[in-house]
A protein has these predicted regions:
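Walker A/P-loop
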Residues: 216-261, 318, 323
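P-loop NTPase nucleotide-binding/switch module
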Residues: 170-207, 211, 238-293
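Peripheral, non-AAA+ core regions of ATP-driven protein-machinery
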Residues: 1-216, 220-227, 329
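Conserved AAA+/SF3 P-loop NTPase catalytic/coupling segment centered on the Walker-B
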Residues: 273, 289-322
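Alpha-helical scaffold elements adjacent to nucleotide-binding pockets in ATP/GTP-utilizing enzyme cores
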Residues: 47, 51, 84, 123-127, ...
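Loop/turn-to-beta-strand initiation segments
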Residues: 134, 213, 297-300, 323-327
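Conserved Walker
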Residues: 218-220, 286-293, 306, 323-334
Length: 334
């Protein structure tokens, strides 16, 4: 018995398509997983097995083998739990995998069979749109985030039993409710007009914004440098929908999107501490993640007390300032 379910894994700032293959055969009962997996993905074996038991699915004593392909892509995160569980259920005949052939599945599974929220749902929804897929199945808490895209059907689920019941019926035609006009609204808590006095500083900020220049502010403490910098995003042009979506994908991968504000509508203002490391500033790590420069994309990166930063940290800024991009090389890719 064989089944395949489609999902996605995060790689850098985007999601890559992954297939979850499950084979069930006779032999010594076992549950094996392969496919270049990180520790959190390997731990899904116990989560999925226990969740299926607590959901009321009694699996026969068989040899179960799960493969996540392509094998040369490192799989990380907990979003593969739901597609693994679905693939096992399909292999044992509890649901028809062909119903889900045009859907992307993403979600973490709890031991009580509940479907828990995960990171990178918006990026996975964008991937589903690019691949021409019909929809995406996500945890209920991530539904509003995935529903940003009009062309992708979003099916939210709360637990495995509900998921199987939905799959056994005809998948709903209606998506999760979208408040399209509200989610794209731009609102700032501050405004540049609140900056009183300081005509030279105001003029310098306006010139820097007009030409998209870098700006160096010097002055005694309490003269209004930080106050002015925090209000610069309010006089920048409003982000386009494409820019908002691109920025929201970055924040989704970092788990920074709020349930109440699923779109990053405002230009970001990032102010790292002067003790920040090079990795935290430009991003990186064994599993590359965005740094402060990437989180300030389309916005403002404010280095307060510039002289307090280590020279090596300031040297790291040279390439991003000149090339307008961050390039990180790792053993597994760049």
């Amino acid at each position: 018995m064989y089944s395949v379910i489609k999902t996605a894994v995060v790689c850098g700032f985007e999601s890559l398509p992954v297939k979850v293959e499950t084979d069930v055969s006779d032999g010594m009962p076992s549950f094996d997983m392969v496919g270049f997996l990180t520790s959190e993905v390997k731990e899904a074996r116990e989560r999925v097995r226990t969740a299926l038991k607590n959901a009321g699915f009694r699996l026969p004593a068989k040899k179960i083998t799960i493969n996540l392909t392509p094998a040369d892509v490192r799989k990380s995160g907990t979003g593969c739990d739901l597609p693994m569980a679905a693939s096992v259920l399909a292999a044992f005949g509890f649901l028809d995998e062909h119903i889900l052939s045009n859907y992307l599945l993403l979600g973490e599974v709890g031991l009580n069979s509940s479907i828990l929220p995960t990171k990178g749902v918006l990026s996975a929804a964008v991937l589903a749109q690019k691949e021409g897929m019909q929809g995406i199945v996500v945890p209920w808490e991530n539904a509003r985030e995935a529903a940003i895209l009009d062309t992708v059907k979003v099916i939210p689920v709360k637990n495995l039993k509900e998921f199987v019941q939905i799959c056994q019926q005809e998948l709903p035609e209606t998506c999760f409710y979208r408040e399209q006009q509200e989610i794209w609204k731009t609102e700032y808590d501050v405004d540049f007009s609140e900056l009183r006095g300081q005509p030279m500083l105001r003029r310098a900020c306006e010139i820097a914004v007009s030409g998209m220049h870098n700006l160096l502010m010097m002055g005694p403490p309490g003269s209004g440098k930080t106050m002015a910098a925090k209000r610069i995003p309010t006089i920048l042009p409003e982000l386009s929908r494409e820019e908002k979506l691109e920025l929201s994908q970055i924040y989704s991968l970092c788990g920074l999107l709020e349930q109440e504000r699923i779109i990053q509508n405002e230009r970001p203002f990032r102010i790292p501490h002067n003790t920040v490391t090079a990795q935290a500033l430009v991003g990186g790590g064994k599993q590359p993640h965005p740094g402060e420069i990437s989180l300030a994309h389309h916005g403002i990166l404010f280095l307060d007390e510039l002289a307090e930063f280590k020279p090596g940290i300031l040297d790291v800024l040279r390439e991003p300032l000149e090339e307008k991009k961050v390039h990180i090389s790792r053993v597994g890719g760049s």
